[in-house]
């Protein structure tokens, strides 16, 4: 066990109780409230490497990684050092900074689809902007998204969405005008025939298809062989754009993202998480002729006070430099596969039906026999059993995402010893379920 002392969360309970009078649900993002797993949310105090400490002094091995950005580990000394130097020059300029050029060149060099890039402040903002760009470039209004894929909380995307919407069991969200979502068409993930049928019904009105190339917001779901290739062919056939939401997969499943890993080049890509090194960031980019539509070069307006923030750019640059070191992704592949194989074996030995998988530093397990190919399959998972598993792991010093419907994220800071320790704890917890 990571925690050698009794699991006490008195301070977390006090802080969370006060927070509920100050913020809706006591949190700044819904999944943090532990609604789907029950129990007391943990209030963090500090992070380092693969470990986190809460305000009560409990220590955990972390597999959330701030929901993806901490691929090099928390508070990496090189990132912290670079940020301290940048901080001495100021926190925000609201004007061009040299760091934007450096990070932009790194992104363009790495991601096959990106010839030009625009920095924003979050993945949601990137997806909102790329939605407008899709429609501006094509002159069409409708889009296709996939059930369970999450692209932020913009109105047009809150249709059969994943992430917190899946966690809370919400079909959509109040406050979204019905007219807004009429132009959003949905299909099951991994179902090319359903996508083709939508194009046949709407041959001249679909601006594009947007998806997570590897789903991480309905749990972890890989694309079937030929699925991404089929989408590329269909979008070309009907004159629509293909958009990969790589906010989660970008620079995580490979240095060039899922598109480099699978060899499929979309027209546009959204990024976030890793490229900010733990600071708020987002980006969207693609072919130069499409990006030329974006103001001030073109007529499609999009702006942001803190976009291209020098601190976020600095953290992103240093993070990508670390990831460029030889062997980084081979190591991430190795430890993540070791983790998932160990978890699945532990579950099977204890008599539980669990399935799962991984790709580089991204993984997931479902409390279901599987296979899980889409959102409907994911919803068959035993969320009550997952909640008990989550609590058992938490009390023994392992911090997993507090939802069955979220992927997990190991980092370069995780050691094989920590992976093996996690598997040993899981064996203990599975035996109690």
UniProtKB/Swiss-Prot annotation:
Keyword terms: Chlorophyll biosynthesis, Cytoplasm, Isomerase, Porphyrin biosynthesis, Pyridoxal phosphate
Residues with the N6-(pyridoxal phosphate)lysine modification: 273
Its pathway is: Porphyrin-containing compound metabolism; protoporphyrin-IX biosynthesis; 5-aminolevulinate from L-glutamyl-tRNA(Glu): step 2/2; Porphyrin-containing compound metabolism; chlorophyll biosynthesis
Please state where this protein is localized: Cytoplasm
- Specify the enzyme's EC class, one word: isomerase
Give the InterPro entries listed for this entry.
4pyrrol_synth_GluAld_NH2Trfase (IPR004639), Aminotrans_3 (IPR005814), Aminotrans_3_PPA_site (IPR049704), PyrdxlP-dep_Trfase (IPR015424), PyrdxlP-dep_Trfase_major (IPR015421), PyrdxlP-dep_Trfase_small (IPR015422)
GO terms classed as biological process: chlorophyll biosynthetic process; protoporphyrinogen IX biosynthetic process
Co-factor requirement: pyridoxal 5'-phosphate
Report the GO terms under cellular component: cytoplasm
- Tell me where on the tree of life, at the top rank, the source sits: Bacteria
What GO annotations for molecular function exist for this entry? glutamate-1-semialdehyde 2,1-aminomutase activity; pyridoxal phosphate binding; transaminase activity
EC numbers on record: 5.4.3.8
Question: Which reaction does this enzyme catalyse, per its entry?
Answer: (S)-4-amino-5-oxopentanoate = 5-aminolevulinate
Keyword Magnesium listed? The answer is no
Point out the coiled-coil segments of this chain. Answer: none
Which family is this protein grouped under? Belongs to the class-III pyridoxal-phosphate-dependent aminotransferase family. HemL subfamily.
Summarize the subunit comment. Homodimer.
Quote the NCBIfam families the UniProt record gives: hemL, PRK00062.1
- By what name is this protein known? Glutamate-1-semialdehyde 2,1-aminomutase
Native organism taxonomy: Bacteria, Bacillati, Cyanobacteriota, Cyanophyceae, Synechococcales
Provide the gene name from the record: hemL
């Amino acid at each position: 066990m990571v925690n050698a002392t009794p699991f006490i969360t008195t301070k977390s309970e006090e802080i969370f109780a006060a927070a509920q009078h100050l913020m809706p649900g006591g949190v700044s993002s819904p999944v943090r409230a532990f609604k789907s797993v029950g129990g007391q949310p943990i209030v963090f105090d500090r992070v380092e490497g693969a470990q986190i400490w809460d305000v009560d002094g409990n220590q955990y091995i972390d597999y959330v990684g701030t929901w993806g950005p901490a691929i090099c580990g928390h508070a990496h000394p090189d990132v912290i050092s670079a940020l301290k130097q940048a901080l001495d020059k100021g926190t925000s300029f609201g004007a061009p900074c040299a760091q934007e050029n450096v990070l932009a060149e790194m992104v363009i060099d790495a991601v096959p689809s990106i010839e030009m890039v625009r920095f924003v402040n979050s993945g949601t903002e990137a997806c909102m902007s790329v939605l407008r760009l899709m429609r501006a470039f094509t002159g069409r209004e409708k889009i296709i998204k996939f059930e369970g894929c999450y692209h932020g909380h913009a109105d047009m995307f809150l249709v059969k969405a994943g992430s917190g919407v899946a966690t809370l069991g919400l079909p959509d969200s109040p406050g979204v005008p019905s007219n807004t979502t009429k132009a959003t068409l949905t299909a099951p993930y991994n179902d090319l025939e359903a996508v083709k049928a939508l194009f046949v019904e709407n041959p001249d009105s679909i601006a594009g298809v947007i998806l997570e190339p590897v789903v991480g917001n309905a749990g972890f779901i890989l694309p079937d062989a030929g699925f991404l290739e089929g989408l590329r062919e269909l979008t070309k056939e009907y004159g629509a754009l293909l958009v990969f939401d790589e906010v989660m997969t970008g620079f995580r499943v490979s240095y060039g993202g899922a598109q480099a890993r699978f060899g499929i080049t979309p027209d546009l890509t959204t990024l976030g998480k890793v490229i900010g090194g733990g600071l708020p960031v987002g980006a969207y980019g693609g072919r130069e002729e499409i990006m030329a539509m974006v103001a001030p070069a073109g007529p499609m307006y999009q702006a942001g006070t803190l976009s291209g923030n020098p601190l976020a750019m600095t953290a992103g640059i240093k993070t990508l430099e670390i990831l460029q070191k030889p062997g980084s992704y081979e190591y991430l592949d190795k430890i993540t596969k070791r983790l998932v194989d160990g978890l699945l074996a532990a579950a099977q030995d204890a008599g539980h039906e669990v399935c799962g998988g991984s790709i580089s530093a991204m993984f997931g397990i479902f409390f279901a026999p599987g296979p899980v190919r889409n959102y409907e399959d994911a919803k068959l998972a035993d969320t009550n059993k997952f909640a008990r598993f989550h609590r058992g792991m938490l009390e023994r010093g392992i911090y997993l995402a507090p939802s069955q419907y979220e992927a997990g994220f190991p980092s370069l800071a995780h050691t094989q010893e920590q992976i093996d320790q996690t598997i040993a704890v899981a064996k203990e917890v599975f035996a109690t379920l």
